Amino acid sequence: MSSILPFTPPVVKRLLGWKKSAGGSGGAGGGEQNGQEEKWCEKAVKSLVKKLKKTGRLDELEKAITTQNCNTKCVTIPSTCSEIWGLSTANTVDQWDTTGLYSFSEQTRSLDGRLQVSHRKGLPHVIYCRLWRWPDLHSHHELKAIENCEYAFSLKKDEVCVNPYHYQRVETPVLPPVLVPRHTEILTELPPLDDYTHSIPENTNFPAGIEPQSNYIPETPPPGYISEDGETSDQQLNQSMDTGSPAELSPTTLSPVNHSLDLQPVTYSEPAFWCSIAYYELNQRVGETFHASQPSLTVDGFTDPSNSERFCLGLLSNVNRNATVEMTRRHIGRGVRLYYIGGEVFAECLSDSAIFVQSPNCNQRYGWHPATVCKIPPGCNLKIFNNQEFAALLAQSVNQGFEAVYQLTRMCTIRMSFVKGWGAEYRRQTVTSTPCWIELHLNGPLQWLDKVLTQMGSPSVRCSSMS
């Protein structure tokens, strides 16, 4: 390998020898791409070695990597950019780009703790875990620190541990099967589904106290929001959300109301495409549905061709597009990143403008009205769906009958608008009044509902939760 660096120290060569490689790239241009990857990895390792030599932690890093031992000590670097990169405290937030990263050509550290090596950005523990352990790693949501790591990323200390063997991959929890009684009665018509599309939803801001780029969501919801008539809507919430908190709905604590019924276990299975995304401008569907197969993907406003990890809205045409929609599309920018990791879905705002999310599952978690729209500012992320919470609600709803289960269909649909919000606090009061928005259908939970509804007894007119 012809290095772009004038000299590669022996310790860097040794550490690069332990680098984990992804599957063979193959195809035209694979050699050039691999060469660029090798050069980037060399830069990342050389930069880290340079920093660790100053603190005497280099030997511990080499020991951890060569022995692959989690009982090694923490290998830390400062978590503030001014300490590690010598940047002046005069650097303001306005000087950082849309991901919170200052643009230096070699290696920089952002205000939110992200690291940039040769124009490629990421959190330092993610970069080095990807390099030495998991080449397919996408996000910090996929990692959790081992118990004896004193400087884990989640602890938000002045220093952060980059020892790749102090982190583990988050495993997707196995959802318990739902015991479904086979009912003999056949419904003559499908029960009405609660629809909040044309109602005026309440609004809430991103939960207070959550730091940007943090995967921590406080258990205590924000104070009760204000309804249209100016009164707090806590009473309305209590009436609407009478299913209790997710912690109270563990499937293991629920039992069928009639033990004499024929009970059949209905299991959850992961589909090939975990979600489907449709793009709308006002009330008009635009373009084809995007089917997500990768655990991490972005929906942005650029004109690059879409691929399995990227849904670009910039190329989509609409003859009915007006000036407001056109202007909004210009401000989508880097859009939103969606993660599906460990049975949880996260939305991270990458745009310079906020995104607005209506997630009944998230609203259930915080005790908000099911139709509440949450504003997510730039640089922040929010958990918008949790499979285990949904499984608990499904297990409880089965005991309440076909209609209660069917009502869970709306929990599997998430609406998200770019730049412009909607709801009681906005001029636009329905999602179809916003210039640019997307609708996510979570295929795994929807297909699980289908199987449960079929087991419970399908209506005479065939209609499923996917219809």
Curated annotation (Swiss-Prot):
N-acetylserine: modified positions: 2
Compartments, as annotated in UniProt: Cytoplasm; Nucleus
Modification N6-acetyllysine occurs at: 19
Domain MH1: residue ranges: 10-176
Domain MH2 as annotated: residue spans: 274-467
SMART domains: DWA, DWB
GO CC terms of this entry: activin responsive factor complex; chromatin; cytoplasm; heteromeric SMAD protein complex; homomeric SMAD protein complex; nucleus; protein-containing complex; SMAD protein complex
Ranges where the record places region Disordered: 207-251
Main location: cytoplasm
PROSITE patterns given in the database record: MH1 (PS51075), MH2 (PS51076)
Motif (PY-motif): 221-225
Binding positions (Zn(2+)): 74, 149, 161, 166
Tissue occurrence: Expressed in cardiomyocytes.
Summary of the function given for this chain in its UniProt record: Receptor-regulated SMAD (R-SMAD) that is an intracellular signal transducer and transcriptional modulator activated by TGF-beta (transforming growth factor) and activin type 1 receptor kinases. Binds the TRE element in the promoter region of many genes that are regulated by TGF-beta and, on formation of the SMAD2/SMAD4 complex, activates transcription. Promotes TGFB1-mediated transcription of odontoblastic differentiation genes in dental papilla cells. Positively regulates PDPK1 kinase activity by stimulating its dissociation from the 14-3-3 protein YWHAQ which acts as a negative regulator.
Assigned protein family: Belongs to the dwarfin/SMAD family.
Stated name of the protein: Mothers against decapentaplegic homolog 2
